[in-house]
Swiss-Prot record:
Belongs to the methyltransferase superfamily. Fibrillarin family. This is rRNA 2'-O-methyltransferase fibrillarin. The lineage of its organism: Eukaryota, Fungi, Dikarya, Ascomycota, Saccharomycotina. S-adenosyl-L-methionine binds at residues 180-181, 199-200, 224-225, 244-247. Its EC number is 2.1.1.-. PROSITE patterns: FIBRILLARIN.
Amino acid sequence: MAFQPGSRGGRGGARGGARGGARGGRGGFGGRGGSRGGRGGFDSRGGARGGFGGRGGSRGGPRGGPRGGARGGRGGARGGAKGGAKVVIEPHKHAGVFIARGKEDLLVTKNVAPGESVYGEKRISVEEPASEEGVPPTKVEYRVWNPFRSKLAAGIMGGLDELFIAPGKKVLYLGAASGTSVSHVADVVGPEGLVYAVEFSHRPGRELISMAKKRPNVIPIIEDARHPQKYRMLIGMVDAVFADVAQPDQARIIALNSHMFLKDQGGVVISIKANCIDSTVDAETVFAREVQKLREEKIKPLEQLTLEPYERDHCIVIGRYMRSGL
């Protein structure tokens, strides 16, 4: 019994650089870090865990090093797929639309307002050789057109034969929202073309107006597409009508605008969302009914395409407006 305190003190010395008798400040040399105080004096566990930098030393190395490096790399990749010579731009079968071939193939349009992105999309700058000798090559900027964000892009990716939207054309866009797809349509028609963008809701309408400030070929109209007579003084005759209004009476809305603004033999491109028209029947039945309504309004259907896998229960219908009747 007499020796117990002494032996405990000794044990304390071994355990913590005098955790028992003279409890040496819980850590001998270097407090909790040094050789980790001693939870075993200089034993292997203490050394490995604490070392001379303890937690900061061994763990901090990898944390600051590779992780920081990797993050930097990611940041670099995100600034837009600026491939230069690595990316090859090829024209798509639809004029004004292009394919960027690199690590992955991307649908792109030539940016009407270089340096400006609309919804955070990637931009690709490519040097195009000059047509004359002695003239430096020009940089052309393209914007990636995401088919998951745009019904028209989804239709192009799905293989639409006819688009009616091409460089120099005038397009009436119904249901413009904040201008995501409108900005790409503006790129397709180019500086010689025009896009009349009609949107009824004021909040996305504000974003549409701010986008149009940078693109002189977009004319934003904050008005109800059900009443085309309210904006008839702003719009001339157009070559194509694109509609993405998602309303039960959308066939009527398209017909009213086509009768008022669309040229004879002009194109009609309609995105149909089945659930917005009738959610009680299957999508195919809804699409068939809508196509029949278009026929009754002198719009001859040319093709119908589902937007899977980009959109569920959506289709896109291309038609030609026959003013004199089908």
